[in-house]
C-alpha cells in the first residue's frame, strides 16, 4: 500500500491533543471498519503526543501478542516516523526508544493474550498506553495497564474493530466515552485515502450480514439467525431419545 495524505478523521487522531477543547480529555477511542487507517494514524499520534509532552518517561504499546504487535505496528514505526524521530528497537528487551534532540522516551511492548497477562505489566509506572485491537484483550489486562498510568498528564489510546454489542469494552468505554472524558472517533474505509477503490470494492463484496456490518460499516452488531450455513435440521438435530443412549 502506498501511503497518501491523511484524511480529516486521521488528522483528528494525530492532533486531537493539541486542540484546546480536547486537551483535558483522558484519552482517545478509535473504532470502525477494517482497513480504515486507524492503526497508522493512532501510532503516529501516540508517539507525537508522548514526545511533545514528556521526557525520559515510560510508555506501553499493547497488542494481543507481542508478535502480532510487531508485525502490525512496530515494524512500520521507523518508516511512519521517518524525518521526525530516531527510533531504536531493542527486541531482546521488548522495547523501543524514540529520540529527538536531547529528549527521549521508552516504549515497552506487551501482549494481552489471556487472563494471566495482567501480571506481565504489573509494577511499571507509565505516562501513557496505546492498546492496538483492544477488543481482543481481556479486561483484566487492559485495566491493569491503565492502572499503571500514574504520571500526571498520562492518557489512554484505544483502537479496535467492532465485536458484539455485549462486549465489555463497548459497554464500558464506547457507550460511556463522554462520561469517561474520552474523545471517540468512528472510522470507515472512506477515511483511508491510501486504500485503492478497487480494493475497497473487493472488501465490500466479501462480506454479508453481521460480518458486513462489523467489518465494512464498523458497527457493534450481534449475530442473528444461523451461524453455520451448512446446518441441516434432518441431519444435525438429535432426537431426545438418543440422549439416553449409553
Language model feature labels by segment:
Residues 61, 109, 184-186:
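Conserved beta-strand scaffold positions in the cores of enzyme catalytic domains, especially
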Residues 127-137:
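SF2 helicase catalytic motif II
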Amino acid at each position: 500500500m502506498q501511503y497518501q495524505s491523511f484524511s480529516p478523521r486521521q488528522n483528528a487522531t494525530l492532533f486531537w491533543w493539541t486542540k484546546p477543547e480536547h486537551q483535558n480529555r483522558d484519552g482517545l477511542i478509535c473504532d470502525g471498519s477494517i482497513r480504515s487507517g486507524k492503526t497508522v494514524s493512532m501510532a503516529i499520534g501516540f508517539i507525537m503526543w508522548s514526545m511533545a509532552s514528556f521526557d525520559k518517561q515510560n510508555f506501553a504499546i499493547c497488542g494481543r501478542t507481542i508478535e502480532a504487535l510487531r508485525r502490525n505496528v512496530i515494524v512500520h514505526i521507523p518508516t511512519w516516523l521517518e524525518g521526525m524521530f530516531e527510533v531504536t528497537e531493542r527486541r531482546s528487551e521488548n522495547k523501543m526508544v524514540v529520540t529527538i534532540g536531547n529528549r527521549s522516551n521508552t516504549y515497552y511492548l506487551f501482549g494481552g493474550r489471556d487472563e494471566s497477562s495482567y501480571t506481565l505489566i504489573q509494577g511499571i509506572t507509565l505516562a501513557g498506553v496505546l492498546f492496538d485491537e483492544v477488543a481482543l484483550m481481556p479486561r483484566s489486562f487492559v485495566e491493569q495497564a491503565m492502572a499503571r498510568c500514574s504520571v500526571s498528564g498520562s492518557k489512554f489510546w484505544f483502537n479496535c474493530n467492532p465485536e458484539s454489542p455485549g462486549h465489555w469494552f463497548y459497554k464500558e468505554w464506547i457507550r460511556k466515552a463522554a462520561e469517561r472524558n474520552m474523545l471517540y472517533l468512528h472510522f470507515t474505509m472512506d477515511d483511508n485515502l491510501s486504500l485503492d477503490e478497487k480494493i475497497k470494492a473487493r472488501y465490500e463484496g466479501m462480506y454479508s450480514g453481521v460480518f458486513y456490518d462489523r467489518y465494512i460499516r464498523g458497527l457493534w452488531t450481534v449475530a442473528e439467525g444461523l451461524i453455520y450455513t451448512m446446518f441441516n435440521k434432518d441431519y444435525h438435530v438429535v432426537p431426545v431419545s438418543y440422549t439416553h443412549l449409553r
